Amino acid sequence: MNRIDLSFNKVKEENRKALIPFVTCGADFTVEETADLIVSLEKEGATIVEIGVPFRDPLADGPVIQNAYTKALQNGTKVKDVFRCVELIRGKSEVPIVLMVYFNVVYFTGVENFLRIAAKSGVDGLIVPDVPLEERGDLDKICEDNCIYLIPLVARTSKDRIAAITKGAKGFVYCVSTNGTTGERKTLDSGTHEYLEEVRKNVDIPMCIGFGISSKEVVKEVKDYCDGVIVGSAIVKRMAEGKEAVIDFVKDLSDGLK
């Protein structure tokens, strides 16, 4: 069974919600430091960890993550370094790892080659924000062949479109809380709860909400409408402050989910 499924089964048994921090690799932390951080985050309540693969033109991301990617690339971070980070994590932990990666990175590595290395490294899921539904078929098949879940991103759209995007999804559905890029927001857009309820009608796997989840207060606001929360920019911003700042923030978020 995929580690993502095992983790959601566990949080369900414990009657709690999943906490999914997003981290970057090679910007403020070295590969080794990133791996150590992720192992520590699991101990502090992280259910799954999402790792962003640096890219020069991350259109779905806001300035905090864009700047982290730029710094990582300037530091010489490559795709192979992200895979090495996952391998280091696997030496110490079975926490599920999901890569957030733009398709150009996958394409230039070679789709089959990328997925093969990802599986060998210990990756459990893939989020590819710039691949539309109509072009997902081949990638979905190669992911399946490598026992990696292709996690769908679902934005606020028509009921028919939501149904099409989530059809056959595995692992969890990534619900985008707001139209636009990633980034911290003090409150969520109006209609978020209704949107999540519409997604819920179409899926029988966990739903997690991301984009704009920035504080314990926002976590408390949405936790009753989803199965987990994904926190990105607020984590990456604290990575620039050091490991303890990230750990303390994740502890606080975890408390908000109880």
Swiss-Prot record:
Keywords: Amino-acid biosynthesis, Aromatic amino acid biosynthesis, Lyase, Tryptophan biosynthesis. NCBIfam families: trpA (TIGR00262). Tetramer of two alpha and two beta chains. This is Tryptophan synthase alpha chain. The alpha subunit is responsible for the aldol cleavage of indoleglycerol phosphate to indole and glyceraldehyde 3-phosphate. One of its GO terms (cellular component) is cytosol. Signal peptide: none annotated. CDD domains: Tryptophan_synthase_alpha. It holds the Pfam family Trp_syntA. InterPro entries: Aldolase_TIM (IPR013785), RibuloseP-bd_barrel (IPR011060), Trp_synthase_suA (IPR002028). It catalyses: (1S,2R)-1-C-(indol-3-yl)glycerol 3-phosphate + L-serine = D-glyceraldehyde 3-phosphate + L-tryptophan + H2O. PANTHER family: TRYPTOPHAN SYNTHASE ALPHA CHAIN, CHLOROPLASTIC (PTHR43406:SF1), TRYPTOPHAN SYNTHASE, ALPHA CHAIN (PTHR43406). The active site is at E50 (proton acceptor), D61 (proton acceptor). The keyword Lyase applies. Belongs to the TrpA family. Its EC number is 4.2.1.20.
